[in-house]
UniProtKB/Swiss-Prot annotation:
This is Peptidase T. GO terms for cellular component: cytosol. It is an enzyme of class 3 (hydrolase). InterPro entries: ArgE/DapE_CS, Bact_exopeptidase_dim_dom, Peptidase_M20, Peptidase_M20_dimer, Peptidase_M20B. Coiled coil: none annotated. It comes from Caldanaerobacter subterraneus subsp. tengcongensis (strain DSM 15242 / JCM 11007 / NBRC 100824 / MB4). It catalyses: Release of the N-terminal residue from a tripeptide. Zn(2+) 1 binds at residues 78, 141, 198. Its EC number is 3.4.11.4. Binds 2 Zn(2+) ions per subunit. It is found in: Cytoplasm.
């Protein structure tokens, strides 16, 4: 069994689900336990400046082995797994020499990873896959990234003939709940640029992501006995439905792909008296993003005009921005990663991130950080899987990026 697989199978045993309702940082104790174990492993490998700080960030340095002027590169992955699915007691299954048929994840519960629902499986006939047992997520997002980074660093340590500058690594908590770099010290990390290793299928590289905002809406109704309600009742639930129906139907997640943005109603709770709604608003284009926010404001204004001032309250908050505008000023970071892939026989696929990453926020904090593939598929659920050869290729790509910058200086 290769080292990257060994590490990955060990890491997924740690229960590191993050919790958006927690007020602590990190949000769960399990992440701190995992952080300390990773720090211990990094020390054993011989890295310097290994630290788990008070916020649970793990950082370490592989010192340069040459006097050449070479940029300091960072590699970053996150320790938490998504709260969307249970991440406790993960029991990975290894499917050797995959035959192209449906994979029974859990016979007892009738859970099947089917080729009709997940046609990408057909790309991995003859390969070895790691799947879930159908009761939890797998945790390839992002424990595969952690395993790949550490294995690449170990390779560089064992191959001193590869000249390199300083290489920094960081493992962050709470990425899945949007807090991953809230307390990250970019200045102390002291890199010229970095890569998150948090992407999907083999060969993907991502340097543009959604602009993101949240919209919290509170609707104040007026409850009156329905028998005497004529001309008096104001049903906040129905006003909420009216608001939703005023948004463009085709601009919902289920109707969009590629570079298309959306409004997503993520939560709706209400009574006649009071209703709360929570939206996320996403778009790649800056102007379209601004237009979407203005449009939801105009709907709220129209409803307040119709039902009375103060009926609908809107709290609109920007969350993160498209890192493309930062990365485009430093395209050598993307170009070198693509060169590394091609030299290893991997065709790079530039895809937009229909979401956000730690790298998006880091880019606006002064650390340009595109995202590299881990090799995984179907993150955040029981159908998550990862091909072993893709993990091994991710290790090679990280090593090659470091090597190329060592040569370029």
């Amino acid at each position: 069994m290769s080292k990257v697989v060994e590490r990955f199978l060990k890491y997924v045993k740690y229960h590191t689900t993050s919790d958006e309702n927690s007020n602590t940082f990190p949000s769960t104790e399990g992440q701190l336990i995992f952080a300390r174990e990773l720090a211990k492993e990094l020390k054993e490998l011989g890295l310097s400046e290994v630290e788990v700080d008070e916020n649970g960030y793990v950082t370490a340095l592989l010192s340069a082995n040459t006097d050449k002027k070479i940029p300091t590169i960072g590699f970053i992955a996150h320790m938490d797994t998504s709260p969307d699915m249970c991440g406790k007691d993960v029991k990975p299954q290894i499917i050797e020499n995959y035959d192209g048929n449906d994979i029974v994840l859990n016979k007892e519960k009738g859970i099947i990873l089917s080729t009709s629902e997940f046609p990408e499986l057909k790309n991995y006939i003859g390969k070895t896959l790691i799947t879930t047992d159908g009761t939890t997520l797998l945790g390839a997002d992002d424990k595969a990234g952690i395993a790949e980074i550490i294995t690449a660093i170990e390779y560089l340590i064992n191959h001193p003939e590869i000249e390199h500058g300083n290489v920094k690594i960081a493992f962050t908590p709470d990425e899945e709940i949007g807090r991953g770099v809230d307390k990250f010290n970019v200045k102390k990390f002291a890199c010229d640029f970095a890569y998150t290793v948090d992407g999907g299928e083999l060969g993907t590289i991502e340097y543009e992501n959604f602009n993101a905002a949240s919209a919290k809406i509170k609707i104040h109704g007026r409850n009156v006995h329905p028998g005497t309600a004529k001309g008096k009742m104001k049903n906040s639930i129905l006003i909420g439905i009216e608001l939703q129906n005023m948004l463009p139907e085709l601009e919902r997640p289920e109707h969009t792909e590629g570079y298309q943005g959306f409004y997503h109603l993520n939560n709706f709770q209400g009574t006649v008296e009071e209703t709360s709604m929570y939206y996320i608003i996403r778009d790649f284009d800056k102007q379209a993003f601004s237009d979407k926010k203005e449009y939801i404001k105009s709907i709220v204004e129209a409803l307040n005009k119709k039902y009375g001032e103060g009926t609908v309250e809107l709290e609109l908050k920007d969350q993160y921005y498209n890192m493309r505008e930062v990365i485009e000023k430093h395209m050598h970071i993307v170009e070198t990663a693509m060169e590394a892939m091609r030299s290893l026989g991997i065709e790079p696929k530039v895809v937009p991130i229909r979401g956000g990453t730690d790298g998006a926020r880091l880019s606006f904090m002064g650390l340009p950080t595109p995202n590299l593939f881990t090799g995984g598929h179907n993150f955040h659920g029981k159908y998550e899987f990862i091909p072993i050869h893709a993990m091994e290729k991710a290790v090679e790509v990280i090593v090659k990026i470091v090597e190329l910058y060592g040569k370029k200086g």
